[in-house]
Regions:
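Alpha-helical residues within the helix-turn-helix
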Residues: 26, 37, 66
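Short alpha-helical DNA-recognition segment
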Residues: 29-48
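Short, basic-rich loop-to-helix N-cap that marks the start of a DNA-contacting helix
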Residues: 53-63
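Short C-terminal boundary/hinge segments that cap the last helix of small helical domains
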Residues: 69-79
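A short, Lys/Arg-rich alpha-helix, primarily the initiator
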Residues: 3-27
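Hydrophobic micro-packing sites on short alpha-helices
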Residues: 61-65, 75-76
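Residue-level preference for short helical/loop micro-motifs built around acidic side chains
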Residues: 15, 34-37, 74
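Residues within the helices of the helix-turn-helix
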Residues: 22, 33, 62
Length: 79
């Protein structure tokens, strides 16, 4: 039986998610502060996500996708 590195997978998905949030936010042309307002979240929370320092709830994932006007799955796609 193979053992997965759960912690490694967790770090990878946090990096993919945070990087995509930053990419799509910049493409949208909004600052972290304005984006946080659009999401109904605090600016430091957005910064922590983009800098890979925070895990995130499903509710907040949906808020972010809605504010970016994209499908949620795109935030988890590696390039």
């Amino acid at each position: 039986m193979m053992h997965k590195n759960i912690e490694g997978d967790k770090v990878d998905i946090i990096k993919v998610f945070g990087g995509n949030v930053r990419k799509y936010r910049i493409e949208k042309g909004v600052s972290q502060e304005k984006f946080a307002e659009l999401c109904g979240l605090h600016r430091t929370y957005i910064s922590d996500i983009e800098c890979f320092r925070r895990s995130i709830s499903l509710d907040n994932i949906q808020k972010i996708a809605n504010a970016l006007e994209i499908e949620t799955y795109k935030l988890f796609m590696e390039e």
